[in-house]
Amino acid sequence: MIRATRVLGQHRWKEAAADSVLLDFDDRHRRRLAMTGTRGLEFLLDLEHATALRGGDALVLEDGRLIEVVAAAEPLLEIRAGDPHHLVRLAWHLGNRHLPTQIMAKSLRIRRDHVIEAMVKGLGARVIEIEAPFDPEGGAYAEPSHAHGDHDHDHHGHDHHGHDHTSHDHAHHSHAHHDHDHGHAHDDHVHDEHCGHDHHHGHSHAHDHK
């Protein structure tokens, strides 16, 4: 099986991709994983270190072909505040709980969590359930290339974006025990002015290799 051994960050490649893989947040943090692209190309992701991939990155195959990484839509909560000060206050409470959080211009996005939803509503936030790609902040110790997506990720190991110690465990455990079905038309997605993401269709199947 042909291997993908390097990663090109966002905006670092212009060639047409030979295939693409549709991956959620968890499956975008991998080192070695057998994958099948949306057009059927089978390959082995075989990186030097576990690397946090982002939508728009490219995996480089041994023969030079590229596989585009597409961030799959997943169930999220979009948290909206009344003003900038309120938004900062909400962000502080999420950060205090070590929740992976995506910071938007006027809102915050987290994975769906009914406990946290109740908490932020109690703090006066408006909460909307959406489905969109999840791209949380990498944290203060993330590599600059990971934070901005404009450098080659060939030999950088990245810590995970963060850990939710309330209800989710995002450690580097195997996801071989469950399947992801990403091949829908996404008719039930909520798209608003904050979304800004294209939703690619197709299936990508990933299996862990120890």
From Swiss-Prot:
SUPFAM superfamilies: Urease metallochaperone UreE, C-terminal domain (SSF69737), Urease metallochaperone UreE, N-terminal domain (SSF69287). Residues 197-210 have a biased composition (Basic residues). Gene3D superfamilies: Urease metallochaperone UreE, N-terminal domain (2.60.260.20), UreE, C-terminal domain (3.30.70.790). Residues 136-210 are annotated as: Disordered. GO terms for cellular component: cytoplasm. Residues 145-169, 178-196 have a biased composition (Basic and acidic residues). Keywords: Chaperone, Cytoplasm, Nickel, Nickel insertion. It is found in: Cytoplasm. Transmembrane segments: none annotated. One of its GO terms (biological process) is protein folding. One of its GO terms (molecular function) is nickel cation binding. Involved in urease metallocenter assembly. Binds nickel. Probably functions as a nickel donor during metallocenter assembly. HAMAP family: UreE. Belongs to the UreE family. This is Urease accessory protein UreE. It comes from Bradyrhizobium sp. (strain ORS 278).
